[in-house]
């Protein structure tokens, strides 16, 4: 195949939902996008606990346990998480994929994951990630945020790859992004 063999771990980064869409302690309900339920995302618990996920995988599976053999990627909110996790733990992942999303910091949060956004980004890029890949559709509702993030990277001379496709925040785009990203890993 085009991509190297790899272990893929898919976490539930949707911190205010206990399970897959439609499954929760509340019974079979549609996922909520209520701001009061999303508020806990700003506490950074998911990002702060991420090393535990890495430790679990490395303890239970045959892995190459080092930065050059780890990647993190996500779509939509997962892109937000991947951006923040990779900059908060700059020695953990050498490959970063942001599909339809990014982050530009959160001035209101006191969580260490979100504070000093630009300083942490500077540290991450000083360590020269092997690949920092960003992709977004032209009509995606997060397009402006991604453009702002890319401007920040450009203004600081940070190296990244960018792929722009048509359409918006849809699975068709995310499949394209993964198809482009995966073969670039671990080279």
Where are each of the predicted segments found?
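Non-catalytic cap/lid and distal C-terminal segments of serine-dependent acyl enzymes
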Residues: 1-187
